[in-house]
């Protein structure tokens, strides 16, 4: 079940609120300019699936997003607990960073924890299959896939180079809860 935990930056151990209803999550994130939608991930995709397999299975949804928002690049991140670089990838994604463009993710399998640092608050969004999240350009955030990742997410970009992170150098991510395996 998707959820949203909202923390004040001074209280990383105690959330101000925890939401589990889709409408509540979507409206709370919309107040911060973050899009949170539920799309149908109908194809049976397992973590570890190839990029070609995932894109082929979800071409209709990808085309819709690309047309709707003008995205020009798409890729897939598909990780399971056997991935040889899971520790390195987790460490990189756990560093607070921002992008010069919106960060769009459509989860077609598994789950991951997207954590957004907006002003004095931290929004921890547990994304699961069928969740689409679009984080506005410039928003500080990090992503936790857990010690034993199990997810597939389609990523869309305005930048032809794909995923380009600008790391903040802040250690805030280490103070907040991570995805529990």
Regions found by a protein language model. Give the residues of each.
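Double-stranded beta-helix
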Residues: 144-181
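Short, conserved beta-strand element in jelly-roll/cupin
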Residues: 98-118
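Conserved short histidine dyad/triad with adjacent acidic residue
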Residues: 75-100
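Conserved metal-binding segment of the jelly-roll/cupin
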Residues: 127-147
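N-terminal leader/capping segments at the start of a protein or of a new domain
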Residues: 1-71
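Short, solvent-exposed loop/turn segments at secondary-structure junctions
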Residues: 86, 114-116, 123
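Structural signal for conserved beta-strand scaffold positions within catalytic alpha/beta enzyme cores
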Residues: 8, 38, 75-78, 155
């Amino acid at each position: 079940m998707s959820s949203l935990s909202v923390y004040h930056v001074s209280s990383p151990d105690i959330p101000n609120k925890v939401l589990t209803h889709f409408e509540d999550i979507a409206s709370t994130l919309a107040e911060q300019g973050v899009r949170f939608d539920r799309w149908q991930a109908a194809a049976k995709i397992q973590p570890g699936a190839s990029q070609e397999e995932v894109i082929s299975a979800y071409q209709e949804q990808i085309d819709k997003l690309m047309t709707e928002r003008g995205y020009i690049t798409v890729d897939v991140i598909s990780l399971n607990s056997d991935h040889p670089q899971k520790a390195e990838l987790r460490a990189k994604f756990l560093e607070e960073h921002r992008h010069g463009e919106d960060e769009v993710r459509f989860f077609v399998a598994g789950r991951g924890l997207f954590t957004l640092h907006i002003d004095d608050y931290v929004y921890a969004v547990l994304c699961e299959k069928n969740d689409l999240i679009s984080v506005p350009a410039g928003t500080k955030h990090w992503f936790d896939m857990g010690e034993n990742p199990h997810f597939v997410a389609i990523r869309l970009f305005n930048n032809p180079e794909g995923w380009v992170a600008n790391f903040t150098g802040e250690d805030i991510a280490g103070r907040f809860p991570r995805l529990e395996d």
